[in-house]
Amino acid sequence: MGSASEQRVTLTNADKVLYPATGTTKSDIFDYYAGVAEVMLGHIAGRPATRKRWPNGVDQPAFFEKQLALSAPPWLSRATVAHRSGTTTYPIIDSATGLAWIAQQAALEVHVPQWRFVAEPGSGELNPGPATRLVFDLDPGEGVMMAQLAEVARAVRDLLADIGLVTFPVTSGSKGLHLYTPLDEPVSSRGATVLAKRVAQRLEQAMPALVTSTMTKSLRAGKVFVDWSQNSGSKTTIAPYSLRGRTHPTVAAPRTWAELDDPALRQLSYDEVLTRIARDGDLLERLDADAPVADRLTRYRRMRDASKTPEPIPTAKPVTGDGNTFVIQEHHARRPHYDFRLERDGVLVSWAVPKNLPDNTSVNHLAIHTEDHPLEYATFEGAIPSGEYGAGKVIIWDSGTYDTEKFHDDPHTGEVIVNLHGGRISGRYALIRTNGDRWLAHRLKNQKDQKVFEFDNLAPMLATHGTVAGLKASQWAFEGKWDGYRLLVEADHGAVRLRSRSGRDVTAEYPQLRALAEDLADHHVVLDGEAVVLDSSGVPSFSQMQNRGRDTRVEFWAFDLLYLDGRALLGTRYQDRRKLLETLANATSLTVPELLPGDGAQAFACSRKHGWEGVIAKRRDSRYQPGRRCASWVKDKHWNTQEVVIGGWRAGEGGRSSGVGSLLMGIPGPGGLQFAGRVGTGLSERELANLKEMLAPLHTDESPFDVPLPARDAKGITYVKPALVAEVRYSEWTPEGRLRQSSWRGLRPDKKPSEVVRE
């Protein structure tokens, strides 16, 4: 699957009328499928899509299309199914762009089976899997009305409820009703067919005057045919939310059971369905809750079995960000090589480089473009078991950050030029695609670097989120993660200046830290550390830091030394900077917390015992890279926290009805904020009142979010300019990129919105 920038669909013949009776155009169809993508994709993702196309409109002949054409875009997911007549490659529609392609093809109808493809462990090859749901097609015989269909539907529902299954109704957009039932455990298509047939036969026995389970058309007059056969692995059903190629643009529309009690029940048109989605969301939300909507890590996951390999295999969809880390891993596989990975759009774009990157400009080295890897892989070291994909030992050879000059990794004319800043390797490199997945890696001449050490332009080095449990003390040092505000401090022979992580001069905001000037009066130093306020147990408290007064005791805990008496230390190894820092602390009253004992697991347990926020692991040979988020520093927290940008607010209810009830959260992305959900828990009345006052001058009519919000979240909101940063605690990220069970921790005036990234 290609990157978002590679997935484009151009609408042609937009004004072409496809439904003459209503004047509905191809552009209308395009807009419809874009509008239903969020709710429809879960019900078709992972399944082979058969299309029924009306390129010249519904008043002209249509045709079914199964085989994916050679002209189909390369980013479209696909898989092959063996039939009696041969093999067929089907598209798998698992993205909004895929649905846009459906509309561009004038494929008004999308038909899918009740099973999904499953990946073979190791190879990642997709093969037909078991059924994940049942479907019953209630087909009315001559003279049967919708009220009779509804009566049979309720009988099916009650029969399935007796065996613990829930049922969801869908008006088919044609004449009948479809009933869907999610299966707690997938079963073979044959097993699903047998079960569905038994249900239909039992219903026929209970309601012989109204129901038939027999396919013979001559026996259907005045009855409802409960078609159980569409559960067969070789059959398909019109997908929920699909348009129908009839005179009017009706839709296979999910309904409520209450609606089936309405004598005036009828089929719905596409514009009615869009209105309902905006109001009600997806009525089939529980049908395909585990739908495997594809993302840039789909191929990576298919090639690995989480029960057999220690490699990180995240289930959540990667979130686009602007991180710029790189890692080179020494991979002792069957064919030893190096893996070069660049963080890009929420994943690690990866190449296997047999001879590593060249160390001079006179040679080129082969690089093989491989599957995107998760960001967590940047800190992975370990042994992949024999028999698994990529079996062998993986060791981090180098890591750091990079600057981008050019980044085009499209399937045809790829070219990437980056400037690496690592511990063992640095400089400008070009990777140029030559044929397919084969690239050439070339070292370029460096442009003159005129950077000098200036405190006013200095930004703190940042850590990547990861797990420290497998890290060894021989290579890593472990510090406590303190729940305070990050500060850079310059003390110059009796004068002191403080700068926040965002670059603001905050010297006046910390009168309690003026003593640093006297403590370090004999030196000119630049320190990196944390301003903390301790609770009664001696543990840094973010809440007390937030609500501190001028008389509150604030301490500065130093953890890095960047400059000492005329010598810049940015290029010095961490373990050497640490020794200098400890020497400085021994000669002054500077507070330098001790390193945590043992390997990563022991350090993590120690920090938990003391009630600290977590652990920061730092490679002992790492250099300090200002303003960069690097894999050579890893943070691992005992609870999940996330910085967010406030993009709007919703009025409260009850006691909060006159003010802010909850805040809309976002993570900055290329097109605006990426919606991350709402937070209201943990906000005190005082904080709510202060927030309302702070947000008032930021009100705007324009949404700061990159896509329209779901209907349930967009109701009754006031948008604001994305200027305020906050921090929340949460239980997990959902597959849709939302924070689950979020609770408020406080504003982060020390952070800029542009600095916020998904942890």
UniProtKB/Swiss-Prot annotation:
Entry note: cofactor: Binds 4 Mn(2+); 2 Mn(2+) for polymerase/primase activity, 1 each for 3-phosphoesterase and ligase.
Disulfide links within the chain: none
Binding, Mn(2+) 3: H331, H337, D339
DNA-binding region: 13-16, 26, 53-55, 63-67, 71, 83-88, 104, 137, 215-220, 227-235
Region (DNA repair polymerase domain (Pol)): 9-261
Residues noted as binding substrate in the record, renumbered to the chain: 52, 111, 137-139, 172-178, 230, 236, 244
Record region (Disordered): 740-759
Residue ranges of the region described as 3-phosphoesterase domain (PE): 297-446
Binding residue positions for Mn(2+) 1: D137, D139
Gene3D superfamilies to which the protein is assigned, alphabetical: 3.30.1490.70, DNA ligase/mRNA capping enzyme (3.30.470.30), DNA primase, PRIM domain (3.90.920.10), Nucleic acid-binding proteins (2.40.50.140)
Reactions catalysed, as given in the entry: ATP + (deoxyribonucleotide)n-3'-hydroxyl + 5'-phospho-(deoxyribonucleotide)m = (deoxyribonucleotide)n+m + AMP + diphosphate
Biological process annotations from GO: DNA recombination; DNA repair
Biased composition regions of type Basic and acidic residues, renumbered to the chain: 747-759
InterPro entries per UniProt: DNA_ligase_ATP-dep_C, DNA_ligase_ATP-dep_cent, LigD_ligase_dom, LigD_PE_domain, LigD_pol_dom, MtLigD_Pol-like, NA-bd_OB-fold, NHEJ_LigD
Keyword annotations: ATP-binding, DNA damage, DNA recombination, DNA repair, DNA-binding, DNA-directed DNA polymerase, Exonuclease, Host-virus interaction, Hydrolase, Ligase, Manganese, Metal-binding, Multifunctional enzyme, Nuclease, Nucleotide-binding, Nucleotidyltransferase, Transferase
Chain segments carrying region Ligase domain (Lig): 460-757
GO molecular function, one term: DNA ligase (ATP) activity
Region (Not required for ligase activity): 1-411
Protein role: With Ku forms a non-homologous end joining (NHEJ) repair enzyme which repairs DNA double-strand breaks (DSB) with reduced fidelity. Recognizes, processes and reseals DSBs, including repairs on incompatible DSB which require 3'-resection, gap filling and ligation. Anneals the 3' overhanging strands from opposing breaks to form a gapped intermediate, which then can be extended in trans by using the termini as primers for extension of the annealed break.
Family according to the record: In the N-terminal section; belongs to the LigD polymerase family. In the central section; belongs to the LigD 3'-phosphoesterase family.
Protein name: Multifunctional non-homologous end joining DNA repair protein LigD
Organism listed in the record: Mycobacterium tuberculosis (strain CDC 1551 / Oshkosh)
Lineage: Bacteria, Bacillati, Actinomycetota, Actinomycetes, Mycobacteriales
